[in-house]
Amino acid sequence: IATDAFLGVHASHSYIFAIILSPVGSYYANGMDPVKIYIEREYVRCVKGGTGMAKAGGNYAASLIGQEKADKMGYAQVLWLDGVERKYIDEVGAMNVFFVIDGTVITPSLEDGNILPGVTRASCVEVLKANGYKVEERKLSVDEVKEAHKNGTLTESFGTGTAAVISPVGEYIDGDEHLVINDSKIGPVAQFLYDELTGIQWGKKEDKLGWIVKVN
């Protein structure tokens, strides 16, 4: 939080850095039940060269109108597209996003700097690779996802984040098109990741990746 005693527009020279710890329940009211996601075509969350890669309060301001649209239509979150072509997938409002297409787990790459490099995202990529899954971090268009849904190779989609951990996606809505995934049921990859991550966090599974640090 900026603390300069100044009224105007400039970067602050002093700040308060605070960490808040609080017990929480499931991020979504229905827990691990797959959610419905609205694909936003009109508004964008951020653009290349901006602050999309940062956990900054200002990034949320740009997402509010799109999220209000989704709320009114009964959808849990917004799938944001790139700010130039409105073609490539960035992320979901509160999560990074993954797709399982033809056995490969795909998540949008971070190269353009407009996607938050989430810790849970990175953890999932590491766990998947360590367990023999094929993982690709690359540009992924909505059209490619639609084609995979059409030909039956899109078998799963899920979001990842600190609050939600793993959130299965049961349906994407793009205008009049409804892309129902895995009969709106949680898929095996999402379930595996949730079990692995929470198992390591709670000490119920062996930490083979060296994440756990003993605090004296």
Q: Which residues does each PLM region occupy?
A:
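Helix-start/capping segments and mature chain N-termini
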Residues: 7-216
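Short, glycine/charge-rich beta-strand/loop segments that flank catalytic centers
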Residues: 1-5
